[in-house]
Amino acid sequence: MKQAVIVDCIRTPMGRSKAGVFRNVRAETLSAELMKGLLLRNPQLDPNAIEDVIWGCVQQTLEQGFNIARNASLLAGIPKTAGAVTVNRLCGSSMEAIHQAARAIMTGMGDTFIIGGVEHMGHVPMNHGVDFHPGLANNVAKASGMMGLTAEMLGKLHGISREQQDAFAVRSHQRAHAATVEGRFAKEIYAIEGHDANGALIKVLHDEVIRPETSMESLAALRPVFDPANGTVTAGTSSALSDGASAMLVMEESKARALGLPIRARIRSMAVAGCDAAIMGYGPVPATQKALARAGITVNDLDVIELNEAFAAQSLPCVKDLGLLDVVDEKINLNGGAIALGHPLGCSGARISTTLINLMEHKDATLGLATMCIGLGQGIATVFERV
């Protein structure tokens, strides 16, 4: 079977969704800039060789509608001979894009793919136009479509305290801030234009949503937002609302080597799994277990892990049940996570994978895992290997 490898991976800075640096920049532009960036960074690649552009996006309406993958690829000047498709596995959409490209390569259905994802949550809110079928109530808990309440449920089932959640959130901001100051995001962030608070055009170089001043004291002052009477989940322990895009160049290994392109990581295994929609945040556990089994390894073999931080109350049960509580500070979300950086839905899968690959290089690690929960009860996971 042919091998799928990551040749390059980049992301935009994460912009604040409310009056942030990308308030005047459309989702198609965020996407197109990254597509162009991949080609500029890898001049050995003939753009005419691109088989398909596979782009994750959840709210496929307004500027994100009508196949944003194609709109963005045309804006980017990618040859019209390349295909383009937008995929939606909710929060796992751009990781699904990785999987689709990898499967195509493994089965001989192309050797060069641009994949990624985008979500401009400032322009297209996550609940825009949502209209669940009334019949879902027959076998799905009514609150399953409210992600914050599913996090409350998961936290209660696993005995996760308010203090544990607050500490996890503080860690996320502290580590993301340290990664920024120390330049550890520099290799993955592809600077693009945005606007400052006064409306002046600027080159955006850093994430806008990290709050380095976050402390246990400041978080303790926040009220529960989803279950005000009995809850523990606050805005401070939930993923930030942000706008952003991420992208990867995925190729068949021998083709990349023949062109003299770098092999940054090989896709070792992939998996998706379902779980009860009422505890959708638990999805990374069964998905990771599948991916590890397919790779023929155990969780102890992993050197670095990126677990998407939808909520602290959701992340901690996954860490606990995967047997990783004792190695959080050595292996998990070492540059912070979505609580600090935000979770632009369609962007996040390729974003955490990009951060993971850069961390693996920084630490000279061999095996890494990227995994995330998915609304309505799914998980998705990818094992990467440096070669």
From Swiss-Prot:
What is its pathway?
Lipid metabolism; fatty acid beta-oxidation
Kindly give the Gene3D superfamilies that the UniProt entry links to this protein: 3.40.47.10
Q: Give the annotated active site.
A: C91, H343, C373
- Tell me the Gene Ontology biological-process terms attached to this UniProt entry: fatty acid beta-oxidation; phenylacetate catabolic process
**Gene Ontology molecular functions:** acetyl-CoA C-acyltransferase activity
Return the NCBIfam families for the record: AcCoA-C-Actrans, fadA, PRK08947.1
Q: What is this protein called?
A: 3-ketoacyl-CoA thiolase
Q: Which organism is it from?
A: Shewanella sp. (strain MR-7)
Q: What is the lineage of its organism?
A: Bacteria, Pseudomonadati, Pseudomonadota, Gammaproteobacteria, Alteromonadales
